[in-house]
Amino acid sequence: MKTLRLIGMAVIAVIMSVNFAACSDDDDDTIDTSSLEGTWGLVRSAGWELCSEETEKDTWDYTNDPYNPDYDSEKIVIKKLSDNTYSITSYYYSGSDWQMDGSQTGTLDGKTIVLKDHDGWFEYANPVIETLTTDKLVLRIKYDLSL
């Protein structure tokens, strides 16, 4: 359960910048996908989940330095395969080396990455892009056990 929590929800806040970027309030459901491809290291993960009995709420909020990885470090590599299809490969840091955790493909529907397979990092969720710039990617994950 801890691994699932760390792997799945860690992507809530995949951020590659230590700079603050202010954006105008925009309700547009489209994004500029030209910045989506690349390697994105986890900077902050925050969230909560209900335990199996749904009586206890487990919360977490931790930070990582993607430039100095340690045992909690994670990253994803996003590559464009065709016009609207992307591969997402996830990695975790183990010892002194990055280990592949899984690979998925998906398409963009507005700001949502609709995954074709759910056996990788986003096992129970289709991530929603909250922020995307050339140096910052913020994803929101809401688990959906029906996937």
What annotation goes with each model-predicted range?
Residues 4, 34, 40, 56, ...:
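N-terminal compositionally biased, intrinsically disordered segments and leader/signal-like regions
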Residues 30-31, 56-68, 95-97:
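Short consensus segments that form the blades of beta-propeller domains
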Residues 32-61:
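Tryptophan-anchored aromatic micro-motifs
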Residues 46-51, 68-140:
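Contiguous, well-ordered beta-strand patches that form the walls/edges
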Residues 1-10:
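Bacterial N-terminal signal peptides that target proteins for export
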Residues 145-146:
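Short glycine/acidic-enriched loop and turn motifs that connect beta-strands
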Residues 3, 16-43:
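Bacterial Sec-dependent N-terminal signal peptides
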